[in-house]
């Protein structure tokens, strides 16, 4: 399997893009070299994100703070809060970059997770292909939010920026407008690509581990027709060892993705709230480009909350299904030592497997529903206050 098929096929292109945008190590070995190339690879992320990403986000927040009223602040808050979640994601992946790189390397190369037969290969390729194309579409839709907003303002009579931020010079004239517009477009492109690729990375870790739990279920099911107790016992022991290692991977994954999921869920209710508030003040006739961009933005934000909740829920569901798979084995015809082994495994399975965000709550579909309800409550309160 490893010689001609890639176990992380769906992430190969995404990781290359993340390297170009300073979000993923080129390699741990090359960055440790005390050469000019090693220095550039170590510090490239700072050279890219300090003058653009962090400066741009700071100017957005400055624009929100100096706004004269709630309506003007709402035009920038929906995006500046989104970018605040991005800051947490970037700092988190920089902090855990070595651990994340080693986790990805283990998922790709560790012999413990090799696929054994063509059925497993077909299953793996099918799921990887679906993940890849789904997230390619998600990335294109997210970039569409940026470029529909950037295009829409070009058809307005006056000078208007697609995404408001504080500009330290007079920009509402023909000569200087394009400087402000260009920095706006560059900043939004960089932050958008950074945001969606980091989302994809976090979701991929969750997705890959859920696939490993599904793989365990498939292998337990295959033991149903085994008649030889010796082979059956060997297969069970291999499954138990693999399960223990997957649990260890789950904890590593939780440590890496927990900060970004926590920040995303906490801030998402406010983001959707201010996005809905802005939609109330953007007319489709007056500014159709901005209106369509806002609709896309709200849909992407809902998807951005839903995806980690969905994949976190998948881990819990497929880990819990292993109990049912044990009952489907040929345990009634096994010798007493094998039954004792299965009983010990069943006791091990009683401990639930969940991904927790900062040890506050389990990442799953219930927290997604609560976040949407909170966003609606905040929006209703904001509309009442503004009226």
UniProtKB/Swiss-Prot annotation:
Membrane topology term: Multi-pass membrane protein
Protein localization: Cell membrane
Topology, Extracellular side: 67-75, 155-191, 277-290, 384-387
Pfam family, any one: 7tm_6
Glycosylation sites: 384
Signal peptide bounds: none
Any one annotated GO CC term: dendrite membrane
InterPro entries: 7tm6_olfct_rcpt (IPR004117)
Miscellaneous comment text of the record: The atypical heteromeric and topological design of the odorant receptors appears to be an insect-specific solution for odor recognition, making the OR/Orco complex an attractive target for the development of highly selective insect repellents to disrupt olfactory-mediated host-seeking behaviors of insect disease vectors. Odor-evoked OR currents are independent of known G-protein-coupled second messenger pathways.
Subunit structure and binding partners: Interacts with Orco. Complexes exist early in the endomembrane system in olfactory sensory neurons (OSNs), coupling these complexes to the conserved ciliary trafficking pathway.
Protein name: Odorant receptor 94a
Source species of the chain: Drosophila melanogaster (Fruit fly)
Gene: Or94a
